[in-house]
């Protein structure tokens, strides 16, 4: 009888430990795969790279630094629409970039142009702030250091530029040469049966020096206009938000979007 009692005690003890571990595991999984900015990072550069990887800069190291310095909203922050409503599908966002939305037209391609323009404006490179509209007409910024004029210019750009103009304006870049600031972009006109195009910006790149493998942090805006946010990697929740890049792939699945390899562009 004593042996049975001892066995039962051990059995139920193990069962309790397993149940507790399972509960904690589920809670941890939910916290890290559903909570926005679960570790309360301050900037994109605070998001750690997986073991064995090292961050790499692009041709313009200052641009890489700028993107990594983008501020993030705190733990639990939601992606909000320009209208003030909460966006649907919050689980697609890993962290919200702390930048105000400038207009109801600031959508996916506009978000990419916004980040590029913000970098050039911050560096005082005003003459380089220019984007093409859908008719290939170049819209040049002429407002100098005035923040008011800068935002006014961007709102005008948003009204006449989109994924179509952005995909034509930027230069195609091979996947093997990907760098921070690059853009995955396709226009609706490039996809049979597609009503909308989409654009996603590469905001960070890391490389494993031993294997040569690269991983990416991605950010996007979307329709309707909403906060720019770092995307969650739904396919690898334990590595979220880093996406593994297959440089030999013809097609890439980035969250819920699919891109062709030849749809990577650089400035």
Question: Where is each model-derived feature located?
Answer:
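Hydrophobic alpha-helical membrane-insertion segments, chiefly the h-region
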Residues: 18-28
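Low-complexity, Gly/Ser/Thr/Pro-rich intrinsically disordered linker/tail segments
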Residues: 215-217, 221-267
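Residue microenvironments linked to proteolytic maturation
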Residues: 94
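N-terminal module-boundary/linker segments of secreted carbohydrate-active enzymes
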Residues: 29-89, 102
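Mature, folded catalytic cores of secreted/periplasmic enzymes
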Residues: 72-75, 84-89, 168-172, 192, ...
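N-terminal Sec-pathway targeting helices
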Residues: 2-19
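...with weaker cross-activation on analogous glycine-rich loops/strands in unrelated enzymes
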Residues: 148-214
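Extracellular-facing segments of soluble proteins and assemblies that are Gly/Ser/Thr-biased and enriched
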Residues: 97-177
